Amino acid sequence: LTRSNFNSPSVVISGYFDAGSLFDPDEKLGLADFVTSALMRGTKKHSFDEIYNILESSGASLGFSTGVHKSGFNGRSLAEDLPLLLNLLSEALTQPSFPKAEMEKLRMQILTGLAISAEDTSEMASETFDKILYKDHPYSRPDEGTPESIQRIAREDLVKFQRGCYGPRGMVLAVVGAVEAED
């Protein structure tokens, strides 16, 4: 989907695909979120630092998020840098390298986030509400996983999830800004 808007020399990309936390195996809750968080940590062509240097040097941004049903992405750049942004998006979605050292750093960040959430009464109330309301339904499960499930996730799980759930089937991509639809 494309919409031209030449009020600014920038473009915004946004999209989603079927890879939300509903696809997490019961014993590996948080897998979808882990994969989404890992996409920008390195690809087969670029390291974590290289990706961020490319984005920073062009003033662009690119990020990923996970929901219950879908995972998504958002990016912004100058119109002239749209090919660069789309190439990085494509690399992150189709060629993530899941480097071991970066995955362990990310695992520790996720575990720290879970520990902080465990101290937040609002978070705990929401989690308890979901468990009571949805019982045995996947909606009762924590999207971010548990400390135990995050510890069980191996690099091979990340690779398998990405290969199985990421791809053009069902993906929606919108580009809005200083670009012609034909571009």
Label for each model-derived stretch:
Residues 55-60, 152-161:
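Short amphipathic beta-strand starts and helix->beta connectors
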Residues 127, 155-183:
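Non-catalytic, conformational "gating/processing" segments within enzyme and secreted inhibitor domains
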Residues 118:
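Short conserved segment of the HATPase_c
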Residues 3, 7-40, 46-94, 107, ...:
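M16 family metallopeptidases and their MPP-like homologs
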Residues 93-101:
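Short, polar/flexible loop-turn hinges at active-site or ligand-entry regions and domain interfaces
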